[in-house]
């Protein structure tokens, strides 16, 4: 195993231990752990990453709407990826889009709101 692979393995191990070892892990650390773990187990960790990103945006960045928006956009991307990997995950994507939409509305981003509304409507009619 080369040093890069060893470091990556060590980081993954630390992330797993952090998530398993603490019931009160700060959401920032939770997000960091899920971002790592999703690389090796996307089916297991994409839904958790999407939820943790939303919580992180809400808890830590309510006063920074631009950062909160970026985190919610990342949550939508994780949910989209999950939907692509496994059928029946549209509720995850729907939830992420609704949360993203709320942040767009807060920032009065009308053009992006229209696109998100269209995607939500597609999901509501059996799309994706």
Language-model segments: residues:
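Amphipathic alpha-helical repeat scaffolds of TPR domains
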Residues: 2-20, 43-62, 88-107
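Heptad-repeat amphipathic alpha-helical coiled-coil interaction surface used
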Residues: 31, 37, 49, 56, ...
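N-terminal alpha-helical interaction modules that lie
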Residues: 1-40, 118-128
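Flexible helix-coil transition and linker loops at the boundaries of alpha-helical arrays
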Residues: 34-46, 78-91, 126-128
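Helix-turn-helix repeat elements of alpha-solenoid scaffolds
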Residues: 20-35, 64-79, 109-118
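Charge-rich, low-complexity amphipathic helices
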Residues: 52-60, 67, 75, 119, ...
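Surface-exposed polar/charged interaction patches
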Residues: 18, 37, 59, 63, ...
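A generic hydrophobic-segment detector
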Residues: 101-128
């Amino acid at each position: 195993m080369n040093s890069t692979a060893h470091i990556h393995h060590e980081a993954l191990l630390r992330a797993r231990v952090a998530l398993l070892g603490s019931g009160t892990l700060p959401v920032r650390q939770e997000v960091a752990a899920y971002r790592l773990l999703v690389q090796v187990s996307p089916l297991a960790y994409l839904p958790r990453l999407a939820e943790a990103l939303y919580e992180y945006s809400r808890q830590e960045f309510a006063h920074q709407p631009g950062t909160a928006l970026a985190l919610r956009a990342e949550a939508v991307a994780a949910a989209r990826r999950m939907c692509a990997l496994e059928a029946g995950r549209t509720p995850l994507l729907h939830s992420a889009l609704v949360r993203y939409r709320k942040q767009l509305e807060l920032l009065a981003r009308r053009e992006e709101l229209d696109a998100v509304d269209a995607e939500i409507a597609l999901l509501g009619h059996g799309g994706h």
